[in-house]
């Protein structure tokens, strides 16, 4: 779990202003989990980055698990930002879990020719 966390921090810990791209929203959606709902293992490839905004998380809600190693148990108001190619899943939940998911793609910055 430590290696995934460290790699994700290195991957995301950059100053976007210094890079030659901007982030654009590729797509976004809401998901409303009730008792016994789950999400199978998946990634958000080809999106470059993904995020989950947790709107409602009951204490009995299932965590999100990345690459079978890193378990994140967010609370309402938490935002999780991660590489889009990182596999993750949500086990069967015992409580409500309402989220907004957003995928981002890198868009090259275009400089005007003067």
Identify the role of each PLM range.
Residues 14-92, 96-99, 105-110:
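Catalytic core of non-heme Fe(II) oxygenases with the double-stranded beta-helix
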């Amino acid at each position: 779990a430590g290696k995934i966390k460290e790699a994700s921090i290195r991957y995301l810990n950059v100053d976007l202003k210094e890079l030659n791209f901007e982030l654009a929203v590729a797509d976004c959606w809401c998901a409303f989990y009730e008792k016994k709902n789950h999400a199978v293992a998946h990634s958000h490839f080809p999106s470059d980055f993904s995020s989950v905004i947790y709107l409602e998380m009951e204490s009995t809600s299932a965590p999100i698990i990345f690459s079978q190693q890193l378990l994140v148990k967010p609370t309402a108001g938490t935002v999780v930002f991660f590489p889009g190619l990182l596999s993750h899943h949500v086990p069967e939940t015992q409580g409500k879990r309402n989220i907004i998911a957003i995928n981002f793609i890198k868009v090259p910055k275009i400089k005007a020719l003067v």
